[in-house]
């Protein structure tokens, strides 16, 4: 076994309903879309079931064509993977040599570091309060690769175009994770046209509500996209996943209405949380809300009351932080009552 593997902490996904077999719980931990898929997606899935014994076409040409229409980029600028997580792994595999400098501003998504460590990279974790990233601090590291997240997980805030631009001008490569961007309408994806070293990651798990299907994509230079395609799993995205993803892209009107409902509910939830005096509530551009709790054992006490929320202290935050997925209105109201009872 490689020595580096012994030092890697496994990714911690938090608690799941399966961890509570004797209790009915509401999962507000994983930033999932609480609404059912569109009718077109459900029908596409049912049609695809009969193809489960078959491999999907390995180039995923139909999916890439649909993504090209959605993003406005050429097919040659798109790489696909079994969730954005596979693409993070592929990016590290094609870009990083041993001891290359990687910068991961914190607090942020912990999976970036796992795949960078597997490449034996030299990783720096500068901490920026509230994820207010300082490009000058990053530039001092002279990085080969920088991972940025906007809106950031877990803080929920977006990075400005100016910050992304400055980082792209100082780093050899920049990954901009936009898994939650459809909830903010503040995408920097057009910057790929001006910066060949910028890789924008997207996911079908959040806005499109296909977390169980595992589909992600990257928009980047044709050279980087081709390299990613060389090393990704050849059949990593299942046939049903391909068909449901394409159907989701055809159902944009439905998903925009769902998005608008989630955003309205997010703002209402934020105001309700602010009424609880022992919570410090942060603004959000995503489908979750970060709060700092001034009481011990909040995650455990909420679990006892039937709610799973994410302990965000494992994501580079110091103190008692919890991340709450924006659920349906009735679930959010029950959560507020549970918090008031603590």
Curated annotation (Swiss-Prot):
Cofactor(s), names only, from the UniProt record: pyridoxal 5'-phosphate
Enzyme class, spelled out: transferase
Pathway: Amino-acid biosynthesis; L-histidine biosynthesis; L-histidine from 5-phospho-alpha-D-ribose 1-diphosphate: step 7/9
Keywords, sorted A to Z: Amino-acid biosynthesis, Aminotransferase, Histidine biosynthesis, Pyridoxal phosphate, Transferase
Enzyme nomenclature, EC number: 2.6.1.9
Positions of post-translational N6-(pyridoxal phosphate)lysine modification: 206
Family under the similarity heading: Belongs to the class-II pyridoxal-phosphate-dependent aminotransferase family. Histidinol-phosphate aminotransferase subfamily.
PANTHER family per the UniProt record, alphabetical: HISTIDINOL-PHOSPHATE AMINOTRANSFERASE, HISTIDINOL-PHOSPHATE AMINOTRANSFERASE-RELATED
Protein name as it appears in the record: Histidinol-phosphate aminotransferase 2
Organism: Archaeoglobus fulgidus (strain ATCC 49558 / DSM 4304 / JCM 9628 / NBRC 100126 / VC-16)
Gene transcribed to yield this protein: hisC2
């Amino acid at each position: 076994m490689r020595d580096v593997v012994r030092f890697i902490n496994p990714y911690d996904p938090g608690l799941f309903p399966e961890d509570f077999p004797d209790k009915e719980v509401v999962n507000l931990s994983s930033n999932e879309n609480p609404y059912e898929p569109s009718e077109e997606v459900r029908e596409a899935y049912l049609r695809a079931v009969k193809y489960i014994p078959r491999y999907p076409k390995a180039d995923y040409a139909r999916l890439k064509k649909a993504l090209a229409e959605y993003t406005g980029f050429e097919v040659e600028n798109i790489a696909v993977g079994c969730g954005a997580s596979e693409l993070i792994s592929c990016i590290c595999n094609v870009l990083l040599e041993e001891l290359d400098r990687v910068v991961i501003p914190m607090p942020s998504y912990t999976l970036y570091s796992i795949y960078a460590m597997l490449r034996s990279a030299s990783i720096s974790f500068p901490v920026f309060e509230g994820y207010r990233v300082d490009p000058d601090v990053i530039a001092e590291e002279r990085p080969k690769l920088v991972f940025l997240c906007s809106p950031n997980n877990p803080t929920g805030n977006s990075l400005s175009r100016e910050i992304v631009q400055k980082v792209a001008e100082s780093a050899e490569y920049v990954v901009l994770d936009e898994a939650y961007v459809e909830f903010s309408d503040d995408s920097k994806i057009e910057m790929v046209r001006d910066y060949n070293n910028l890789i924008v990651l997207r996911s079908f798990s959040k806005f499109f509500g296909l977390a169980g299907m595992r589909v992600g994509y990257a928009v980047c230079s044709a050279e980087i996209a081709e390299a990613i395609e060389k090393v990704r799993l050849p059949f990593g995205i299942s046939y049903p996943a391909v068909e449901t993803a394409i159907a989701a892209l055809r159902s944009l009107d439905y998903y925009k209405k769902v998005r608008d409902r989630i955003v309205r509910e997010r703002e209402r939830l934020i105001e309700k949380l602010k009424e609880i005096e022992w919570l410090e509530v942060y603004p959000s551009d995503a489908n979750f809300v970060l709060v700092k709790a001034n009481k011990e054992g909040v995650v455990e006490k909420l679990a006892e009351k039937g709610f799973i929320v994410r302990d965000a202290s494992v994501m580079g935050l110091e103190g008692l932080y919890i991340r709450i997925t924006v659920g349906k209105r009735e679930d959010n109201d029950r959560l507020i009552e549970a918090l008031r009872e603590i």
